[in-house]
Structures are given as structure tokens and as C-alpha cells.
Amino acid sequence: MHDWLNNLPKAELHLHLEGSLEPELMFRLAERNKIALPWNDVEALRSAYNFGNLQEFLDLYYAGADVLRTEQDFYDLTWAYLQKCEEQNVVHTEPFFDPQTHTDRGVPFEAALNGISAALADGRELLGISSGLILSFLRHLPEEEAFKTLEQALPYRNAFFAVGLDSSEVGHPPSKFQRVFDKARGEGLLTVAHAGEEGPPEYIWQALDLLKVSRIDHGVRAAEDPKLIARLIEEQIPLTVCPLSNTKLKVFADMRQHNILDLLEQGVKVTVNSDDPAYFGGYVTENFVALHESLGMTEAQARRLAQNSLDARLAY
């Protein structure tokens, strides 16, 4: 079943480039940039990946991102991810890029964006993988910071097609970012947002009604609100679900408790994604395999999930 799932053509719609930074590459970049890491070796770093919640993960994620300094670093990061896409027959990807993670520590916006864009262009030309980049705002920072990031990005408007919202969800509702999302839409950008991962169903309503999103990232807590589920089905709003991430961050205590197949059978347009694969133990194929092994996902269900991901693409 692993090979069959691996060969299934699919799209990935929920992937943080910084979260695909494998320990080996992190150490290589640290050496290149003469940065001392707080771990002695790759194995020590891997054992640090045993975090228990979103905040513990984010602390590690931001520490790891510190090795990304130059345009070449961002190219290498993105290219490594695209090679993994090729291995797993991910034919289209719409990754997130968090500029604030880098500009706040002095990395020039254009260095990061140019490196990522060059790799995505090579992915299209050399690997045949289509893509579109999503500029994502960090929700634990003020909306004013998101406005600054959008202003920085607009001269490079053709490099990305949408804006998103990620980072610590609890206490940072989508409503906090309504004005900056209005401005982004005014510039012709599409919108997506993380909602209903650790936050309540109300955050999903806000993302739909205030941020006018085309897609909900995560969204698994929608299951707690029957009216919301009915709306997601009626409007066929895609959810970019990340099963291994959800269990690693204890959104579900165990994969056997995950609700993605229940949502699928109800008619919700759910998709399978890897989120931060270097940290959560698997890329898209490993997420499909986990659903098969823990939930008994059938070939027919896998086909529907893969087709959903292709249908839910926003970048063409």
C-alpha cells in the first residue's frame, strides 16, 4: 500500500517551507554560516523534536529557522522540499513562507523571497512540479507588523498569489487581521488562514466571514459545530488537514481518534498535507500511510483525498 499511495498523483496545500528543514540540512547551513547550534549532532536535534504542544514546537521551529541567512540557504531549503515532492508524486504545491520569521532577525526580505522563487522556478522547469507561494502573517505579532510585511512584499507581487495566517492560534483570532486581509484582497491576492486547529470553531467562522478565505488550513475542530460543517459541505470549502501534525501536537491524542475520514464521508472537502514534515515525522505519503494503518483508509478514500487536493488548488 505504501508504494501505491506514494505513486498517487497529489497536491500539497499546507506546507511551511521552514518546517521542511531537515536536521542534516540545518547542520550544513549552520556550518556554512558559522552558527553554533544548541545541539551537538543530528541525533541530539532529532530527540529534541519530542515536543508536547504547539508552543513547544514553535520555540524549536524559530530556533531552527535561524540558520537560514542567505538567498542560497532559502534556495537549498526549497529545493530539498521539491525533491521530496518528486519522490512522492506531489505534482503541485502551494507552500507557505513566513517573512517575519526572517526579517525580524535581519535577513533581507528579497534574499529569502528570491531564493525560494528561484527554487520553485527550477521545480517547474526541471521536475515538472507546478506551484504557487503563499505569504503568511504571524498571528502572535500585531496587525501593524502584518501591514509592514505586506507593504514590503507588494513590489514582488508576482512572486506570490495569496496571503495566509499562521503561528500560535489561541488568543489570536482571525478578526485581529481583518484590515490587512482586506488590503491584500484589494491588491488582487487570494486569502487562506489557519483556523480550528487549537482554536475554536468560531475562528473558522471568522476566517470565512471576516477574512473571506478560499480555504481553511487545519479546520478539524469544525466537527464540533454542525452548522459550520453544513456550510463547509454546501460551499465546498477545502480543509487542508495535517494528520501527523495533529497527533504530534496533541490536537488528537492518537491517530485512531482523527476525524479526517469522518469529515470526508460527510462530504467535507478534506485534503492530506504534511504541515512541518521535518518536525512531525513525515511528508505527504507518510500522512497517507498513517491514515491507512491507523484508520483503515481504503484505496477509494485515498483516491478521493488525493483528488480533493488537486481540485482545491488555488494557484494555476
UniProtKB/Swiss-Prot annotation:
<feature type="binding site">
    <location>
        <position position="194"/>
    </location>
    <ligand>
        <name>Zn(2+)</name>
    </ligand>
</feature>
<dbReference type="InterPro" id="IPR006330">
    <property type="entry name" value="Ado/ade_deaminase"/>
</dbReference>
<dbReference type="GO" id="GO:0000034">
    <property type="term" value="F:adenine deaminase activity"/>
</dbReference>
<comment type="function">
    <text>Catalyzes the hydrolytic deamination of adenine to hypoxanthine. Plays an important role in the purine salvage pathway and in nitrogen catabolism.</text>
</comment>
<feature type="binding site">
    <location>
        <position position="16"/>
    </location>
    <ligand>
        <name>Zn(2+)</name>
    </ligand>
</feature>
<protein>
    <recommendedName>
        <fullName>Adenine deaminase</fullName>
        <ecNumber>3.5.4.2</ecNumber>
    </recommendedName>
</protein>
<dbReference type="GO" id="GO:0005829">
    <property type="term" value="C:cytosol"/>
</dbReference>
<dbReference type="GO" id="GO:0043103">
    <property type="term" value="P:hypoxanthine salvage"/>
</dbReference>
<keyword id="KW-0378">Hydrolase</keyword>
<comment type="similarity">
    <text>Belongs to the metallo-dependent hydrolases superfamily. Adenosine and AMP deaminases family. Adenine deaminase type 2 subfamily.</text>
</comment>
<keyword id="KW-0862">Zinc</keyword>
<feature type="binding site">
    <location>
        <position position="14"/>
    </location>
    <ligand>
        <name>Zn(2+)</name>
    </ligand>
</feature>
<keyword id="KW-0479">Metal-binding</keyword>
<dbReference type="GO" id="GO:0006146">
    <property type="term" value="P:adenine catabolic process"/>
</dbReference>
<feature type="binding site">
    <location>
        <position position="275"/>
    </location>
    <ligand>
        <name>Zn(2+)</name>
    </ligand>
</feature>
<feature type="binding site">
    <location>
        <position position="276"/>
    </location>
    <ligand>
        <name>substrate</name>
    </ligand>
</feature>
<feature type="active site" description="Proton donor">
    <location>
        <position position="197"/>
    </location>
</feature>
<dbReference type="InterPro" id="IPR032466">
    <property type="entry name" value="Metal_Hydrolase"/>
</dbReference>
<dbReference type="InterPro" id="IPR028892">
    <property type="entry name" value="ADE"/>
</dbReference>
<feature type="site" description="Important for catalytic activity">
    <location>
        <position position="218"/>
    </location>
</feature>
<dbReference type="GO" id="GO:0008270">
    <property type="term" value="F:zinc ion binding"/>
</dbReference>
<dbReference type="Pfam" id="PF00962">
    <property type="entry name" value="A_deaminase"/>
</dbReference>
<dbReference type="GO" id="GO:0009117">
    <property type="term" value="P:nucleotide metabolic process"/>
</dbReference>
<dbReference type="InterPro" id="IPR001365">
    <property type="entry name" value="A_deaminase_dom"/>
</dbReference>
<keyword id="KW-0546">Nucleotide metabolism</keyword>
